[in-house]
UniProtKB/Swiss-Prot annotation:
Its EC number is 2.7.1.33. It comes from Listeria innocua serovar 6a (strain ATCC BAA-680 / CLIP 11262). One of its GO terms (cellular component) is cytoplasm. Pathway: Cofactor biosynthesis; coenzyme A biosynthesis; CoA from (R)-pantothenate: step 1/5. This is Type III pantothenate kinase. Belongs to the type III pantothenate kinase family. K(+) binds at residue 129. Catalyzes the phosphorylation of pantothenate (Pan), the first step in CoA biosynthesis. Signal peptide: none annotated. The active site is at residue 109. Keywords: ATP-binding, Coenzyme A biosynthesis, Cytoplasm, Kinase, Metal-binding, Nucleotide-binding, Potassium, Transferase. GO terms for molecular function: ATP binding; metal ion binding; pantothenate kinase activity.
């Protein structure tokens, strides 16, 4: 079995794969102040609930966009699983040709998503990840990662509206059936919801126009379902795209990582 860990700015997603099949997955809050023991106890609790043990795991791979948590995360893997994890970063074999100004600055989550989408759905492909930031990645028909766009995520934008507009309340992110709100809260929720649908559709349309292609559009991330259910711009919703990419990258780099 393989343990895959996706460390995002808001949440960490943990999954267990066996023979390329996702058996279990869990989510925990990303806290850069957690110790390796706290991380270990959390993961072991997940395992206990699923009747798994650390000895079931033969390899671990981690993607992280939060550098401060990585020392504790790597220490946890060694201490509780006796495995030195494979880290997605420079030197890892991805199979992608990165045609960007500085490949090292691309977030590992974007690389993982691009690998998974290209393998699973073919190219050209646009990957939209609705996370703390909303990212759009374009991989051309030759499988070349051409770059993309990064926009503030829906949660960041919602919180900024509350923090910077004195008379506006904090609101929950919710699907709105009416674009014309009858109250301040309803108006904010409508603006946030339909605004992000418009952002998503506009960026995708412009990417298609500038690339002069008709790529398949794949969405992932915690808030993807709510947005994509109302948008015709997205072809495929894949909530486990990042975990799939991690498992695939582990197999591509397996000879040097498995215990």
């Amino acid at each position: 079995m393989i343990l895959v860990i996706d460390v995002g700015n808001t949440n960490c997603t943990v999954g267990v794969y066996k023979e390329q099949k996702l058996l279990r997955h869990w989510r925990m809050t990303t806290d850069r102040h957690r110790t390796s023991d706290e991380l270990g106890m959390t993961v072991l609790n997940f395992f206990s609930y699923a009747n798994l043990t650390p000895s079931d795991i033969q390899g671990i791979i981690i993607s992280s966009v939060v550098p401060p948590i990585m020392h504790a995360m790597e220490t946890m893997c060694v201490r509780y699983f006796n495995i030195r994890p494979l880290i997605v970063g420079p030197g890892i074999k991805t199979g992608l040709n990165l045609k960007v100004d500085n490949p090292r600055e691309i977030g590992s989550d974007r690389i993982v998503n691009a690998v998974a989408a290209s393998e699973e759905y073919g190219t050209p492909v646009i990957v939209v990840d609705f996370g703390t930031a909303t990212t759009f990645c374009y991989i051309d028909e030759a499988g070349v990662y051409q770059g993309g766009a990064i926009a503030p995520g829906i949660m960041i934008s919602t919180e900024a509206l509350y923090n910077r507009a004195a008379k506006l309340p904090r609101v929950d992110i919710a699907e709105s059936s009416q674009i014309i709100g009858k109250s301040t809260v309803a108006s904010m929720q409508a603006g946030i919801f339909y605004g992000f649908i418009g952002q998503c559709e506009g960026i995708i349309a412009e990417m298609k126009k500038q690339s002069n292609t008709s790529p398949v559009v794949v969405a992932t991330g915690g808030l993807a379902r709510m947005i994509t259910e109302k948008s015709s711009a997205v072809d495929i919703l894949d909530p486990f795209l990042t975990l799939k990419g991690l498992e695939l990258l582990y197999r591509r780099n397996k000879p040097t990582t498995e215990k």
